[in-house]
C-alpha cells in the first residue's frame, strides 16, 4: 500500500510541476522577444534542478527504501512524461542544451521525476527557439538533426539502408519520388499509400518524418496516410546522392581490396599448400595408426580364417605361448570369453589336445590341479578321468571328474547317471605335449603316456574333445591311456539314461611310456613306398564285462540295443551322444579287465568317430619276434566312400619289439579328389606276398586321409595267453541330421547269425595269419541317438567261420568288439572300385570268397554309410517303365536311378563286375533283369530315404549295395 501511495503522490506532483512549467514558458514566449542566452539557459537548468530537489524531498519523506523498491514500477513514468511533440524537427537549439538533453536520456537515473522535468525544459527551450526562427515552407534546413519519435536518427538510418540493402534502396527511392510529387502538388493535402507490409510501412513512416509530414495509418492498419504540415520540408540531399557516394566509395574500396586480396591470396596459397601437405601427412598417419589397430584387433580372426582354409597352417602366436611351462588352466583358457574361436585343423588339433571350437562352443579349462606343459616327447603324468561338459561350453583342456560331476545335456534333458563310489579321484599332475608349428611339407608330434607309480590313486586318462556345436569341418582327437588297476565300476542297468561318466580300464602293471607319432602329409606327398603295413592274423574273443553294465535308453535320447539275445552290458568303446545343437563325443565305461589300454579317438563331424584302444592283458603279454604292423582303412568301413568333409582314416599297429622313439605315427593324406591310394603291405614272415589294396571313393572336398600307427606295449607276462586288442568305434552324424525322426530306426535282422556273429572284411586275407581263427564275438549293436539316426548293422557282414575280422598282431589274438555302433573294419564294402581296376579288387576278394557265409545279405536293415543304395523287393513282373513311376519318392530325395544290366541276368547278383553299363533309356522289359541303383547326393540323404521307405508301406525296399560301384561312372551316366 505504501508503494502505491507513493507512486500516486509522485504522479500528482509531477503533473502540477508540468502545468507550472508550461504556464511559465507560455508567459515567457509572450513577453520575451530576444533569444535566450547561454547564461539564461543555465539559470533555468539550475532552477529546474532546484525544483527537482524540492520535489524529491517532498515525495520521499524518509521513504528511500520504498521508492528504491518501486523503481521498477516508476520506470513507466518515463513514457508518460515524454511527449512525442517534444522533439520537433525544427529544434535548432544550442549545443549545450542538446548535450544536456542527451545526457539525461542516455544516463539512467533512479529519479524518474528528474527525467520528466528535463523533458519539459527541453520542450520549453525548443518552443523558444521556434518563436525566434522564421517559419518557411519547404525549407532547405539541414536534416542531420531529424529524429524519429522513438529517438532514431532518421538521416543515419536512411543512409545506412540505402547503402546496405538494394531492395530497401529501391523502396526508399520510390517513396522519395512519390513524396516529392505530393509536396509539389498544392491541390492535395494528404496522400494515402496502398497497403503494404509492416516493414515497408515502417520505412514510409520514417521517410515521411524525415520530410516533416504527419504520418498515420488508416482504419485497416495496413495503409499509411501522410499529411502536409507547416514543418514539411525537402531535404538538401536526395537519396540518389547518397547512393552515388556509396558507389564511388565501393569502387575505390573494391580496387584496394583487390590488391589486398591478391596479396592475401598468395599468402593463403602458400599457407594452404602447407596446410594441405600437413593434412595429407596427418591423414596418412591417422590411416596408418588406424590400420595398425585394425590389424592388431583382427589379426586373430585372420589367422583363424587362414587355419580354416588350409589344414597345413601352423598355430598362432598365442598357441605357441602355451608351450611355456605353466598350469594347464592358463594354457587352454585365458579367462576371456570370445564369441567366436577359429576352428582347429586336423594338423594342429594335436597341439596339446587343446581344441578350439566355433560359435557358442567357448573353450574353457577348469583343471584345478597344477600341471606341466612339455615339448613333444615328454611323458604324461598321472591319468585322469574327465567327462564331457555342456553343449555351449566345451572343454579344451582337462576337467577334474569328481563324484558330483554329471553330464549336462542340451535341449534333451537326459537323466544323468550318478557315478559309483569307485569313481576316480581328482586330477594328478600331468603333462601335455604341444606340437611346434607344423610346416606345410611335414610336421609331427608325439603324445606320450607314462604310468603312475601311485597305486593308491587309480584313474584313467581321457583327453576330452569339445562338443562340436556348428561347424562340420572341425576335427578333434582323443588320446586315452591307462596305467593303473581300476576297481570295477558297476553301473546299475538303466533303460532311460545314457552313460555320463566315462572311465577307461586301468592296467595291472606299470606301463612304459607309450608314444604316438602324428605325421602330416600334404597332397601327393604321402610316402607310399615307405609305409609298410601288415595284417593281423590271430583273433581272440573279447568277452564283455560281467558286472559292468552301461545304461541303454529305450527312449529317444539314448542308444537302443538291437539284439535282444545279447547282454545289455559292457558296451565298451565310445558312445556318440548327438544333440540338436552340438555333437558330443563321450567315452563309455570300458570294462575293467586289467589290460593295458591305449586309445586314440579321431572325431569327424560327417564321419564316424572311432576309438581304437590297443590293450594287452595285465597278466599275459607276448613278445613278438618281428615287426608286423597292421593297416586298417577306416574309410573302407564307410560304405560308398566318404561324405563331403570326410577323411579316410588308416590305422597301423606296430608291436613294441620293433618300435623306437618315433615309430608309432598318425599321418594325414590330403587326397586330390577321388584319387586312389595304393597302400602296399610289406610281406611278413608269416604271410604270403603282399597284394596292393586300393582305397578311393574320397570326395573332392575331403580334407585328408589319416593314417594312425599305434604301438603295442610290452609287458612282463608270459606268452601263454594272448593279449587283447579291441577295436571299437562309434558313428554319429552332424547337425544336419536333426530333422530325422527319432523313431526311424532300424529293426534287427531276423537272422540271429547276422546279429550275433558278424565279422568285417579286413584289408588282406586272414589266410595270411599263422594262427587259428576262432569265432569273432560281437557284444552288441546300437541303433543311434535321437533325434539323429545312428546306424544299426553293418555292410558286408561275414559268417562265423569266415574270420574276416580276425587278425594276429605279432602272434597275439585280436578280436574286433563292435560294441556300440558300425564296425571299424570292412574293407571290401567300400565304393573304391575304379573302372579299370575291378579285376584287382575282385582278385583280392576272391581269396575270401570261399570263407564267406551264405548269410551276407542283411536285408532291409542295412547300415547306410554310402550314397548308393540298391532297390529291392519290387513287385514281381513289374516292368522298367512301371518301376520308374514308383521311384518318385526317391527323386524327391534327390536320388538318381540307374538301371544296370546284370551280367548273369539276375537282379542284385554279386558276381558281376562293377563296370556295368548305365542305361538311361526307357524299355518295356522287366525290372528283374536289372540291378536298380539309387545314387543319393549324400550318405545322409541315403540314410533318411532308407529309414523312410523301409519303414513305410512302399512297394520296394532299399538296401546297401552288395558290390562296389564306381560313383564317377554312375554320376556320369546320370548326367548324360
From Swiss-Prot:
GO cellular component terms attached to this protein's record: nucleus
Renumbered residue ranges of the record's region Disordered: 32-71, 105-147, 257-376, 401-457, 480-560, 661-725, 738-780
Residue numbers bearing the Phosphoserine modification: 37, 143, 330, 333, 349, 853, 855
Biased composition (Low complexity): 306-317, 401-415, 543-560, 692-714, 759-777
Pro residues composition-biased segments: 682-691
Keyword Disulfide bond carried by entry: no
MF (Gene Ontology): RNA binding
Chief place where the protein resides: nucleus
Biased composition (Polar residues): 441-453, 480-504, 748-758
Domain R3H: 169-232
Residues making up the signal peptide according to the UniProt record: none
Residues of the SUZ domain: 233-310
Protein name in the entry: R3H domain-containing protein 2
Source species of the chain: Homo sapiens
Lineage, opening ranks: Eukaryota, Metazoa, Chordata, Craniata, Vertebrata
